[in-house]
Amino acid sequence: MYQRALLFSALATAVSAQQVGTQKAEVHPALTWQKCTAAGSCTDQKGSVVIDANWRWLHSTEDTTNCYTGNEWNAELCPDNEACAKNCALDGADYSGTYGVTADGSSLKLNFVTSANVGSRLYLMEDDETYQMFNLLNNEFTFDVDVSNLPCGLNGALYFVSMDADGGLSKYPGNKAGAKYGTGYCDSQCPRDLKFINGEANVEGWKPSDNDKNAGVGGYGSCCPEMDIWEANSISTAYTPHPCDGMEQTRCDGNDCGGTYSSTRYAGTCDPDGCDFNSFRMGNESFYGPGGLVDTKSPITVVTQFVTAGGTDSGALKEIRRVYVQGGKVIGNSASNVAGVEGDSITSDFCTAQKKAFGDEDIFSKHGGLEGMGKALNKMALIVSIWDDHASSMMWLDSTYPVDADASTPGVARGTCEHGLGDPETVESQHPDASVTFSNIKFGPIGSTYKSV
């Protein structure tokens, strides 16, 4: 993800640690998805989703006193990282009432604003205490999505990260909650907005955000490889691999984390930019959007294929392909119209040429490139989210970015949204009823999850 917003609800609390509360039972909304075979038969899998611990109520283990309110910690309960983990408990979630999350069969709808809550991030579960893990190599991942109610500045995302399957429960003694309560998050931005990392609080060095009343940045970050299958609204979309030097979740320290949350963007062990394929940015301005060849006024089937050398589940990743299906018609991905950049998929050659054409620093190759991304794809957790962007107003996805750059310069124009339309204050006040719906998730060998004719 090129920029990761400081994602918090007014009830935002803690990630990857602390105790479990008893005020409300945790019941994961059921979500059915399908696993397919090479022969094309697909069988239902009875899964569920869990909301990230960062959205949950965090309170004293002794009573209902908040451990975190607004964007500040309770100094008495959280004087330091270790004490905070011992003193504070996560509690169960009211998915629809508090967070605007509703599941029905194979469909999952995420509302943007529900009362005081803004956005959400959820993980697919294999069972009540384990995230569903996927080996994407030599396979394809397919889902339907409705982005018609996602205006400028919003992002209805579906992506994979190399989280621990149990949310870090077995690794870190301070973590008593685990995947059941949505702990253990990490991504390629090495986010420092997480309240708990590796079983300890992130209170030491915490600085409340200047532009988000519910957010802040702590002394630690949480890093891991990230494969963005879908970052999109009704205007623009991108898919983006983000490799890291390590293949698993690791904790980083301060500005050495790099990414959105640190003073030096490229200081860390991950690639915060990635190698993105945004059709608009690649010169095809009519391919995706309202009334486009891929028309965002109607639901879209999105197919992403991970092609390996030798066509094996353990082969080196050599290409990430994209196919769309809409109205019964298969639509191949748009081809690059940028001079010096060829192709309609993500390959090593595409990424190298794109970085050169756009004048972007090639951090992607520095951290392993496509082959490095492939090494992480054999065990990844699935995430869906809806969010706005307090760092750059989602302009990197749907507008011209950087702000002061000439829109005619290759790579600057990413969508048709005017500057200012995506500001969080604007989207939260003008589009609180925005939403995204994901449905009909399918996973299997390449060619097994959709009909090609």
UniProtKB/Swiss-Prot annotation:
Top EC class, one word: hydrolase
Q: Where is the active site?
A: E226, E231
Q: What is its main location?
A: secreted
Question: What is an example of a GO molecular function annotated in this UniProt entry?
Answer: cellulose 1,4-beta-cellobiosidase activity
| Protein's GO biological process | cellulose catabolic process
Under the heading Pfam families, the entry gives: Glyco_hydro_7
Q: Kindly give the InterPro entries that the UniProt entry links to this protein.
A: ConA-like_dom_sf (IPR013320), Glyco_hydro_7 (IPR001722), Glyco_hydro_7_sf (IPR037019)
- GO CC annotation, single: extracellular region
EC number, as in UniProt: 3.2.1.91
The residues forming the signal peptide are 1-17
Under catalytic activity, the entry for this protein gives:
Hydrolysis of (1->4)-beta-D-glucosidic linkages in cellulose and cellotetraose, releasing cellobiose from the non-reducing ends of the chains
Relate the protein's function as given in its record: The biological conversion of cellulose to glucose generally requires three types of hydrolytic enzymes: (1) Endoglucanases which cut internal beta-1,4-glucosidic bonds; (2) Exocellobiohydrolases that cut the disaccharide cellobiose from the non-reducing end of the cellulose polymer chain; (3) Beta-1,4-glucosidases which hydrolyze the cellobiose and other short cello-oligosaccharides to glucose.
The record, for PANTHER family, names:
1,4-BETA-D-GLUCAN CELLOBIOHYDROLASE A-RELATED, 1,4-BETA-D-GLUCAN CELLOBIOHYDROLASE B
For this chain, the family text in UniProt reads:
Belongs to the glycosyl hydrolase 7 (cellulase C) family.
Q: What is this protein called?
A: Probable 1,4-beta-D-glucan cellobiohydrolase A
